[in-house]
Curated annotation (Swiss-Prot):
Name listed for the protein in its UniProt record: Lectin L6
Species this chain originates from: Tachypleus tridentatus (Japanese horseshoe crab)
GO cellular component annotations of the record: transport vesicle
Alphabetical UniProt keywords: Antibiotic, Antimicrobial, Calcium, Cytoplasmic vesicle, Disulfide bond, Lectin, Metal-binding, Repeat, Zinc
Family that this chain belongs to: Belongs to the tectonin family.
Region entry 6 X approximate tandem repeats, spans: 1-221
GO terms of molecular function: carbohydrate binding; metal ion binding
Keyword hit for Acyltransferase: no
Length: 221
């Protein structure tokens, strides 16, 4: 992977085909049009600790675990969605997924207006893709299941603190040492190490974006 640093500082980032969204350590929200090589971030009103976007909407949660969404191009305004989540994923095909402060798992069919259904299991972080949803638990064990919530959780070998399933053909993740791994979908645990260090990452198409331990921003390609 050829990494390019993007100007700016973010603690969490999400990528879509046309936009990057992120939040900084002060929970301020920023938007940049892809590919964002120049780092021309626009601050968006509001305060969020985590964001995730699909082609149409960006979703996020604030320090009180309140849930918000708005159009991915930054138009309109934040709309509150009922429920409480510490982490939300909008990238899953047909479903919003999230986990709450007790690591309980929820899904909601798009366009979600708060009709959450609890899904069995416990995960601390989750990310949806085209056919599967991927997540990690408090022990950094890795799981996947069909993105519509059918079937059951299947453990994938390996250990990650954060995973992204939104890439086209690969799953990406980072471990407790901020080492970066990739695995060809649907991924049964054949992880290969990527150069670099990231604490959080997200993927769109064949592009991966992420932030490191000092909130520097990077993208592949």
């Amino acid at each position: 992977v050829q990494w390019h640093q993007i100007p700016g500082k973010l603690m969490h980032i999400t990528a879509t085909p046309h936009f990057l969204w992120g939040v900084n350590s002060n929970q301020q929200i920023y938007l940049c049009r892809q590919p964002c090589y120049d780092g021309q971030w626009t601050q968006i009103s509001g305060s969020l600790k985590q964001v995730d976007a699909d082609d149409h909407e960006v979703w996020g949660v604030n320090r009180n675990d309140d849930i918000y969404k708005r159009p991915v191009d930054g138009s309109g305004s934040w709309v509150r969605v009922s429920g409480k989540l510490k982490h939300v994923s909008a990238s899953g095909y047909g479903y919003i997924w999230g986990v709450n402060s007790n690591d309980q798992i929820y899904k909601c069919p798009k366009p979600c207006n708060g009709a959450w259904t609890q899904v069995n299991g416990r995960l601390k972080q989750i990310d949806g893709g085209q056919s599967m949803v991927y997540g990690v638990n408090s022990a950094n064990a890795i799981y996947r299941r069909p993105v519509d919530g059918s079937g059951s959780w299947q453990q994938i070998s390996g250990s990650l603190k954060h995973i992204t399933g939104s890439g086209l053909s690969e799953v990406f993740g980072v471990n407790s040492n901020d080492q970066i791994y990739r695995c060809t979908k649907p991924c049964s645990g054949q992880w290969s190490l990527i150069d670099g260090r990231l604490k959080q990452c997200d993927a769109t198409g064949n592009t991966i974006v992420g932030v490191n331990s000092v909130d520097n921003i990077y993208r592949s390609g």
